[in-house]
């Protein structure tokens, strides 16, 4: 990083995650009532989780990306980081120019949630897993029905990210990257450059497969109100160690 790395509000020796780290820190430290971030692979959700905030990753295409610096345009989204669900609902309405959802009489009674069994649970650390299970128990006590389901399409889609994310990101930024590669953090540079190795045929095939998986995933989950997953499998890393590793 070229400037200071934002820290987590209740532990100043660990990082706030990215890429919306400054957005999360500004709300967590009381500098702003809400913030807006971009999320392609977790950049709103994880900083929000690590700072005890609500982060909303909106559906791709729901909010205009005009004026947003792109990473992977077909996956990029914009969403708010707030202190409460109510604030997130108000921010979403403002972003899309709609009427806010009325949460006055909102209830979890009878709502159906699915926990998607994927490899996300294989390597999760104890503390995030305990927090996730505690949240699930709370939902059940409030009347929600929570079921574990196997959705292989989710895991299969994740495997495509190395092809689609890397090729889109490198295709967008290759001229700037190769003009001054030393300006980019080495590990991030390697991730971007991996997109140069993806053939056009593999890129198209990955998109066709993702479209198929999306349809199958929708069919598996359409009967549920939401799918529940941990926001992050790990706790925030130490800022010094992160810069050295």
Which functions belong to the PLM regions below?
Residues 32, 224-225:
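Short, high-confidence coil segments that cap the C-terminus of an alpha-helix
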Residues 125-126, 237-244:
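Glycine/threonine-rich flexible loop motifs
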Residues 54-135, 153-156:
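A short helix-breaking turn/cap at a secondary-structure junction
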Residues 110-114, 164-218, 234, 239:
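Short helix-loop capping/hinge segments that flank enzyme active sites or metal/cofactor-binding pockets
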Residues 1-92:
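Short glycine/serine-rich loop segments
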Residues 127-150, 173-179, 203-224:
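Acyltransferase
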Residues 145-161, 192-193:
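Short connector loops at secondary-structure junctions
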